[in-house]
Amino acid sequence: MPPKSHKCSRKEGEVEEPLLTENPDRYVIFPIKYPDIWQKYKEAESSIWTVEEIDLGNDMTDWEKLDDGERHFIKHVLAFFAASDGIVLENLAERFMCEVQVPEVRCFYGFQIAMENIHSETYSVLIDTYVVDPDEKQRLLHAIRTIPCIEKKAKWAIEWIGSQTSFPTRLVAFAAVEGIFFSGSFCAIFWLKKRGLMPGLTFSNELISRDEGLHTDFACLLYEKYIVNKLPRDRVLEIICNAVSIEREFICDALPVRLIGMNSQLMTQYIEFVADRLLVSLGYDRHYNSKNPFDFMDMISLQGKTNFFEKKVGEYQKAGVMSSERSSKVFSLDADF
């Protein structure tokens, strides 16, 4: 008799979530019952990369040209990222993988865990490469305990791992973590790319932001199409607006983006735009009605009208894996809401 899976409690009167319904066939993949979910897994599988494929050879020349404020900003962005992927990974391993009973979803989550490891390793390598002083290096690598503004973001995400709230609530919360908490930092690093700086850092950012876009897109697919007990709009707004407030405080006030020559007001507008995009993808109306103020973000690998998986940015897609018909539903930056 196989062991029972971890069950997620539900409120009285709620219908059991199909994704969480006990499934004795959860150990076997075929036959595929959720082709759109399986498609997302194949998209993720086709895009695997490793840290060894990132060339940091020219970055140190640019690093030395940056002023102290620019270096401070980049170091603290990397410090947040170095731990954040581990937080997402722990939630997947401890909660979502135990709760969800659909093999296709588990395949995606299993692959996402592998990619979060690669992301975390990449950020650790970047810190190890750029930061020479060993004490500062350790402070940055342990930023969720040593740097208050990073600790605040991490604490918000970690609390959701142990939360007794419903699966749909936590699904929205971690969509906010990956869709909003990373947005300002991704945007700031793409700003450096626009300036022609740090090619290794900016290319790794392109790959990681593409992956995180897919992860967020996947969470939205599960929620919008398969979650039965959807949250009231007010509850979703509470989660999303809280995440926006924390991200705005982090990227605009604590670091802040003016250190690299970016406008804080425009960055706030961009974060609100990203939040609206997330709300729409979850099936709700926009809240902020903010426009994307950064034209250079229209072409990044979170993707606009050209699907990354068609474009093959940097040729990081395994040949043949995505040769079948591809899904056109993409978590896009430039959708007309």
UniProtKB/Swiss-Prot annotation:
Which residues bind Fe cation 2 per the record? 116, 178, 212, 215
Spell out the reaction equation it catalyses.
a 2'-deoxyribonucleoside 5'-diphosphate + [thioredoxin]-disulfide + H2O = a ribonucleoside 5'-diphosphate + [thioredoxin]-dithiol
Q: Which PROSITE patterns match?
A: RIBORED_SMALL (PS00368)
Give yes or no: UniProt keyword Metal-binding: yes
What EC number(s) does its UniProt record assign? Answer: 1.17.4.1
**Keyword Metal-binding (UniProt):** yes
Query: Self-association or partners: how does it assemble?
Result: Heterodimer of a large and a small subunit.
Function noted in UniProt: Provides the precursors necessary for DNA synthesis. Catalyzes the biosynthesis of deoxyribonucleotides from the corresponding ribonucleotides.
Q: What is this protein called?
A: Ribonucleoside-diphosphate reductase small chain
Upper lineage ranks?
Answer: Eukaryota, Discoba, Euglenozoa, Kinetoplastea, Metakinetoplastina
What gene codes for this chain?
A: RNR2
